C-alpha cells in the first residue's frame, strides 16, 4: 500500500537539491577560476585552496590505482538508496532525521558526481591554525558531517522530542 509522498520524509528531498546546487556551484567556480594548488586567503585561518581528492575522507586510499573511484561510488549509491528508503518509511514530521538524511544524500551525490564526471572530488576549503592545516574539504563534506551529527544528536533526544524534532 502506497503512502502520499508528502506525508513521508521524502517531503524533505528539496533539501538534497539545495545541497547539490550549492556544492556543485561552488566546485564549478573553483574549477573555472583556480589553478590546481592555487590558494586565496579569505580570513585568518581560512583559505580557498583547489585540491583534487582521488580517495575518500582525508584522501584515504587516494594512491591505490583507480579502483577506489568505483568502490566509493558504489558506497555512495548504496547509502543514498538506503537513506531514501528510510525517508520514505519516516513521517514528514520527523524533521531532524529527515533533514539529516537529506544533507547526507545531497553531500554524497555531490561527491559522487565529481567522482564519476572528473575522476576525483574537488576540495577547496582549507581551515588552519598556525602551521597546522585540517584536511582540505568541500561543501558536500560539510553537509555529510552536519547530517551525521544530526543523526547522532537525534539518538540522544528523549523519545517524545524525537517524534517532533
Swiss-Prot record:
It is a multi-pass membrane protein. The active site is at residues 123, 141. Keywords: Aspartyl protease, Cell inner membrane, Cell membrane, Hydrolase, Membrane, Protease, Transmembrane, Transmembrane helix. InterPro entries: Peptidase_A8. Pathway: Protein modification; lipoprotein biosynthesis (signal peptide cleavage). PANTHER family: LIPOPROTEIN SIGNAL PEPTIDASE. HAMAP family: LspA. This is Lipoprotein signal peptidase. It comes from Cronobacter sakazakii (strain ATCC BAA-894). The gene is lspA.
Amino acid at each position: 500500500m502506497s503512502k502520499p509522498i508528502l506525508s513521508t520524509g521524502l517531503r524533505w528531498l528539496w533539501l538534497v537539491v539545495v545541497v547539490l546546487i550549492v556544492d556543485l556551484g561552488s566546485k564549478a567556480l573553483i574549477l573555472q577560476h583556480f589553478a590546481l594548488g592555487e590558494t586565496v586567503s579569505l580570513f585568518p585561518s581560512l583559505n580557498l585552496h583547489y585540491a583534487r581528492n582521488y580517495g575518500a575522507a582525508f584522501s584515504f586510499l587516494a594512491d591505490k590505482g583507480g579502483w577506489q573511484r568505483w568502490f566509493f561510488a558504489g558506497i555512495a549509491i548504496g547509502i543514498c538508496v538506503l537513506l531514501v528508503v528510510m525517508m520514505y518509511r519516516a513521517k514528514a514530521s520527523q524533521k531532524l532525521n529527515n533533514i539529516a538524511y537529506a544533507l547526507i544524500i545531497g553531500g554524497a551525490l555531490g561527491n559522487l558526481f565529481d567522482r564519476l564526471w572528473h575522476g576525483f572530488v574537488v576540495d577547496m576549503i582549507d581551515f588552519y591554525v598556525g602551521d597546522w592545516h585540517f584536511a582540505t574539504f568541500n561543501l558536500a563534506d560539510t553537509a555529510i558531517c552536519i547530517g551525521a551529527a544530526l543523526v547522532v544528536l537525534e539518538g540522544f533526544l528523549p523519545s517524545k522530542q524525537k517524534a517532533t524534532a
